[in-house]
């Protein structure tokens, strides 16, 4: 018999389904926009596609698995562990994609004349592949042994049972808090976030310094170039801010769990933290639509062409912005 679902669980499931219904179509639209608009094909937008793929997977895979875990089925330990690992992989992929985006924007303003020779499509593809490979290594580490199998086996043996332990599948019953705090948070989440903050501060400093310079007749219109860079940098920094705002509460709660085992964590706080992490996947397409004109125009074209059956003229694909001369 499947476990009965309480009214609270039903509300939780309803909110999760709503988040998924916003996240999946929104991020598919982001990927679609990059596919149809040549002006969205530079390295930054390739990294944005990688981020969108992770967000689609959150809505299509992680949220259904989170609902399953919330219902609390009894499973073999390693089955539950495999259910818990995808969220770790996708979170790490998002962080590394955001870091790649930050580095890309830094290079655009630091070496505008050499940017296209340094950041080639091939190198961008290699960076994206590297981010995903590293994400799988970090996210699957619990499967390689850093988990709570020993505790589960002792409890299982104490009941006089043999074989692989069967447990009520919950995240904290299979994932070690030492892994979540010392390895995941202190190594793979917090340092990249702090590094990205420093990178964006440097990006804004470089752009402001360039915009403050006097324009000469042969400068290649740096005001226009750096003005566009400033707008895009602000939008991408907002994406980073929302990511940090969404994920830090859950990691802080994990720290409390590890360092203060006797401290009570109200269930409502855990649910809010989980909603924030999943909801972050639905936020990015909204930011793109309101903050980045190329995305907004392409979204409207896709809507008119494929959903309203009112074909519109081709998207005005701006030529690549000419880098200013030194």
Swiss-Prot record:
Q: Where is the lipid attached (S-palmitoyl cysteine)?
A: 309
Cross-referenced PROSITE patterns, in alphabetical order?
Answer: G_PROTEIN_RECEP_F1_1 (PS00237), G_PROTEIN_RECEP_F1_2 (PS50262)
Tell me the membrane topology, using the record's own terms.
Multi-pass membrane protein
Family annotation (InterPro entries): Adeno_A1_rcpt, Adenosn_rcpt, GPCR_Rhodpsn, GPCR_Rhodpsn_7TM
Statement: the UniProt record of this protein carries the keyword Nucleotide-binding = no
Q: Which UniProt keywords apply?
A: Cell membrane, Disulfide bond, G-protein coupled receptor, Glycoprotein, Lipoprotein, Membrane, Palmitate, Receptor, Transducer, Transmembrane, Transmembrane helix
Task: List all membrane-crossing ranges.
Answer: 11-33, 47-69, 81-102, 124-146, 177-201, 236-259, 268-292
Which residue ranges are assigned to the Cytoplasmic compartment in the record's topology? 34-46, 103-123, 202-235, 293-326
GO biological process terms, semicolon-separated? excitatory postsynaptic potential; G protein-coupled receptor signaling pathway; leukocyte migration; long-term synaptic depression; mucus secretion; negative regulation of inflammatory response; negative regulation of leukocyte migration; negative regulation of long-term synaptic depression
Q: Which residues are tagged as glycosylated in the record? A: 159
Q: Which SUPFAM superfamilies match?
A: Family A G protein-coupled receptor-like (SSF81321)
Q: Where is the signal peptide?
A: none
Q: List, alphabetically, the SMART domains matched.
A: 7TM_GPCR_Srsx (SM01381)
Q: Which cysteines are joined by disulfide bonds?
A: 80-169
From the Swiss-Prot or TrEMBL record, state where the protein is found: Cell membrane
Q: Which GO terms describe its molecular function?
A: G protein-coupled adenosine receptor activity
Q: Which family does it belong to?
A: Belongs to the G-protein coupled receptor 1 family.
**UniProt cross-references to PANTHER family, sorted A to Z:** ADENOSINE RECEPTOR A1 (PTHR24246:SF1), OLFACTORY RECEPTOR AND ADENOSINE RECEPTOR (PTHR24246)
Role according to the record: Receptor for adenosine. The activity of this receptor is mediated by G proteins which inhibit adenylyl cyclase.
Would you tell me the protein name for this molecule? Adenosine receptor A1
Protein encoded by which gene: ADORA1
């Amino acid at each position: 018999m499947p476990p009965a679902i309480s009214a609270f669980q039903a509300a939780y499931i309803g909110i999760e389904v709503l988040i998924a219904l916003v996240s999946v179509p929104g991020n598919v639209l982001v990927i679609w926009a990059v596919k149809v608009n040549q002006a969205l094909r530079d390295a930054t937008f390739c990294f944005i596609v990688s981020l969108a793929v992770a967000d689609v997977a959150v809505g299509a895979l992680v949220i259904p698995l989170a609902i399953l875990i919330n219902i609390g089925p009894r499973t073999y330990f390693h089955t539950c562990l495999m259910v818990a690992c995808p969220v770790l992989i996708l979170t790490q992929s998002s962080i590394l994609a955001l870091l790649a985006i930050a580095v890309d924007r830094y290079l655009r303003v630091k070496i505008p004349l050499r940017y296209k020779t340094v950041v080639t499509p091939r190198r961008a593809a290699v960076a994206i592949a590297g981010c995903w490979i590293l994400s799988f290594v970090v996210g699957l580490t619990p499967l390689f042994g850093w988990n709570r199998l020993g505790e589960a086996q002792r409890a299982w043996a104490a009941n006089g049972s043999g074989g692989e332990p069967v447990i009520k599948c919950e995240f904290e019953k299979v994932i070690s808090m030492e892994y979540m705090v010392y390895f995941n948070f202190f190594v793979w989440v917090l340092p990249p976030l702090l590094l990205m903050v420093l990178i964006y501060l440097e990006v804004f400093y470089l752009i402001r310094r360039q915009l403050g310079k006097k324009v000469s007749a042969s400068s290649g219109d740096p005001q226009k170039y750096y003005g566009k860079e400033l707008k895009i940098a602000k939008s991408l920094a907002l994406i980073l801010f929302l990511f940090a705002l969404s994920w830090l509460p859950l990691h802080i709660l994990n720290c409390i769990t590890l360092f203060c085992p006797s401290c009570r964590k109200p269930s409502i706080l855990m649910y809010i933290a989980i909603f924030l992490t999943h909801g972050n996947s639905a936020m990015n397409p909204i930011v793109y639509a309101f903050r980045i004109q190329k995305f907004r125009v392409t979204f409207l074209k896709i809507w008119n062409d494929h959903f309203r059956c009112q074909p519109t003229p081709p998207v005005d694909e701006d030529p690549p912005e000419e880098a200013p001369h030194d």
